[in-house]
């Protein structure tokens, strides 16, 4: 009861709850860890693996027995991350070659996503987990090869298309789990289905990022509804404030001021790994999680979207990506 009260207090005060202190206080009350070998024989795909949370998640998933496909935009940086993780596994007596495989895909480029899915799906006829960790917070408005705003393309369009194209493999691997890395910043954002790329206002990278993170939370809920009978579960999560190269480059002042209090990458990856390795997301379909507990998707009423707006979002994403229900992996 005391632990529950402390958790609620940390959740609502935000500042301590998102720091390393909040993680340590909550972790002290958890009942045990993830059983060794929880993912033995299972295949998991992780995006955004070149550093930080993604790299930490890859290592932990591999240690739990998973065969982890590491998806990187930059093959050189991805190979360096694979070497770092592989070296740690080998030092622990785990054969890295049987646990890790590097893949190349640029989530911001829809052609790259389609090409990767077409190549990967036959190699993974049964897929048991996906962690969408790749993300970007641009300093200014930047365009992708298809002309879309970079944060929207990387954080939303790529994951939307890739997940739908891999649904056949996920269904074949059921019970399987898909986890999307969102952010506490999404609490400030309301879905704008009539302006998904925020073209009607002066560009602000943090605002664009928060909007994409709100969309990710909604997508987890929508997929959970659509796939409730298929054995594929969906969840989104907030990793907390984590000391990563991405945070340092995108929010340098925030990083500099709070660095002593930031979580390390392993703490940031914890909830994602826990969701992929346990049945928690199956018990709370589509929920938004932080530190192994479901959290409210909204803090204030004016960020809530209507059912019509959610439906419009799905249809717009399908139109923009060119994905249809009839495609392989569709319903």
Model regions and ranges:
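Non-catalytic terminal and boundary segments that flank Rossmann-like NAD(P)-dependent oxidoreductase
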Residues: 1-45, 190, 306-331
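C-terminal helical subdomain
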Residues: 4, 8, 12, 21-23, ...
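Catalytic loop of short-chain dehydrogenase/reductase
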Residues: 35, 135-152, 171-229, 238-258
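Conserved glycine-rich cofactor-binding loop
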Residues: 43, 50-51
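Conserved glycine-rich Rossmann-like NAD(P)H-binding loop of the short-chain dehydrogenase/reductase
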Residues: 64-80
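The beta1-alpha1 cofactor-binding region of Rossmann-like NAD(H)/NADP(H)-dependent oxidoreductases
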Residues: 75, 102-118
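A glycine-rich helix->loop->beta "capping" turn
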Residues: 91-100, 119-132, 138-143
